[in-house]
Regions:
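Extracytoplasmic cell-surface/polysaccharide-interacting catalytic and binding patches
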Residues: 1-47, 139-152
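Catalytic and substrate-binding regions of cell-wall glycan-acting enzymes that process beta-1,4-linked
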Residues: 81-84
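Structured loop/turn residues at beta-strand edges in well-structured enzyme cores
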Residues: 51, 79, 106
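Short beta-strand
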Residues: 56-57, 75, 110-115
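Extended, low-complexity, intrinsically disordered C-terminal regulatory tails
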Residues: 43-68
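Catalytic cores and adjacent binding grooves of peptidoglycan-active enzymes
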Residues: 86-152
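Charged, often glycine-rich, active-site loop that binds/positions anionic groups
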Residues: 63-79
Length: 152
């Protein structure tokens, strides 16, 4: 199923972990609707402006989210978030995604610079107010993932 001219449902639901563990990673109608809005209003415009965007993690069923140790409040489980990467001429350029979203004042709920631009987590609520929250992920002194508000 095509979600936009450049993105498919299989691309946003693909998970090697789900495949390996035999976990069904299929969205219900509400989550599918959320994914269509996320792709249409945020990810496809980004793709049109910047070029090919790779979705490294998209929709996660609750079972898959538990298996990978994801947050119980993860927007991935609602079909409202993706983790993405952008490569240009074979080089990772994820900061360009981050900068583009800020410059273009694109509507989003949360954007996280994950570990010095290793990937970008970005979400969009289908209904309700989007927070436009910008965070940076890092490892704290105990080696746990922590988040801080980004300086922009």
């Amino acid at each position: 199923m095509r979600l936009s001219k450049n993105f498919t449902l299989s691309e946003i639901t693909k998970s090697n972990t789900a495949k390996r563990l035999g976990i069904k990673n299929a969205p219900d109608k509400e989550h599918l609707n959320n994914m269509q809005i996320l792709i249409r209003d945020l990810i496809q415009p980004m793709r049109d402006a910047l070029g090919p965007i790779r979705i490294s993690s998209g929709y996660r069923s609750p079972a898959l989210n538990r298996a990978i140790g994801g947050s119980s409040k993860s927007q991935h489980c609602k079909g409202q978030a993706v983790d993405i990467q952008f490569f240009k001429k074979g080089e990772m350029c994820n900061k360009e995604i981050y900068d583009w979203v800020i410059k273009e004042e694109i509507e989003f709920d949360q954007m996280i610079n994950e570990f010095d631009y290793a990937w970008i987590h970005i979400s969009l609520k289908s209904n309700g107010k989007n927070r436009k929250q910008i965070l940076e992920a890092y490892k704290d002194s105990d080696g746990d993932t922590a988040y801080k508000v980004a300086d922009i």
